[in-house]
Design a protein with these regions (language model features):
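A contiguous loop/helix-start segment that scaffolds small-molecule binding in enzyme catalytic cores
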Residues: 2, 71-75, 131, 139, ...
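Class I S-adenosyl-L-methionine
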Residues: 1-109, 114
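Short secondary-structure boundary/capping segments
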Residues: 20, 42, 67, 124-125, ...
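A generic local structural motif
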Residues: 14-18, 38, 62-63, 120-121, ...
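Structural recognition of alpha->loop->beta junctions
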Residues: 26-27, 96-102, 126, 208-216, ...
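Predominant activation on well-ordered alpha-helical scaffold segments within soluble catalytic domains
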Residues: 20, 37, 41, 66, ...
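Class I SAM-dependent methyltransferase SAM-binding "motif I" and its flanking Rossmann-like core
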Residues: 84-155, 198-201
Length: 252
């Protein structure tokens, strides 16, 4: 069996229990070497074959998978965070499907969750934002025009941006053009949950200068929105006057 496993955002102990078990049982592990914490490879058994996909093409990755499957081996394709976000797993799965090779997907903790933990923040605050936009700036991989930063910014929802650290000046321009104020709270979270994690609070207008000052050029998430401010409405969920399926509200 081939299993796509989410390694989590960085810290070794943030891989899921299932992911940890699959890693321990694997005969072959192909890991995203540029992003996955190498400490996780200590879980692999002694004779496990380990491949760093940072140095491989899609065809080379598939060749290892196909041969391993033919030899009856358990294979783990270890991706950073949760593979469903910017993990390039669809093209691998489609090729395996064509070859009628079975595979499964083991979800992981995404780095955008790790960033929230680093910020000690909640992305959905009553009266502020109940939606989260996960997106990226267009780079070598284009972004559909209908999904432009400017169009998303018009909603004033919480935004979490992947793969955009090297384009922060342009990002600020697009956010402001879409409707955010330059003073809107923002944050840069470098390597969330890793030992070298760094959190930088700033504003939409100071994203680029903050990253330059802190010498951050990659491996960071950008969070934008008023949820990073201090004012919000209390949640109804635990309000004494609010009735739920499990608790009757009281008059206050």
């Amino acid at each position: 069996m081939i299993t796509f496993v989410g390694a989590g955002p960085g810290a070794e102990d943030l891989i899921t229990v299932r992911g940890q078990r699959l890693l321990k049982e694997a005969d072959i592990v192909i890991y995203a070497g540029s992003l996955v914490n190498p400490g996780l490879l200590k879980l692999c058994k002694e004779k496990c074959e380990i491949y760093n996909s940072a140095k491989m093409t899609l065809e080379e990755v598939l060749e290892v998978m196909v041969k391993g499957h033919g030899d009856g081996k358990e294979i783990v394709r270890l991706h950073t965070g949760d593979p469903c976000l910017y993990g390039a797993i669809r093209e691998q799965m489609d090729e395996l499907k064509k070859l009628e090779i079975p595979y499964e997907d083991c979800p992981g903790v995404s780095s955008f969750c790790g960033a929230a933990a680093a910020l000690k923040a909640e992305y959905t605050l009553p009266g502020i934002s109940q939606s989260v936009v996960i997106t990226r700036m267009a780079g070598r991989t284009p972004v559909p025009e209908k999904e432009s930063i400017r169009s998303f910014a018009a909603h004033q929802a919480t935004m979490v941006l992947f793969l955009s650290t090297g384009m922060l000046e342009k990002l600020s321009e697009e956010l402001v053009a879409g409707g955010y104020q330059e003073e809107t709270p923002a944050a840069i979270v470098y390597k969330a949950t890793w030992p070298e994690e760094k959190v930088m609070h700033c504003t939409v207008g100071t994203l680029a200068e903050t990253a330059e000052r802190e010498k951050v050029t990659k491996t960071a998430l950008i969070v934008v929105g008023n949820v990073l401010n201090t004012e919000y409405e209390r949640s109804k969920l635990y309000d004494p006057a609010f009735t739920t399926e499990f608790r009757k509200g009281k008059e206050v």
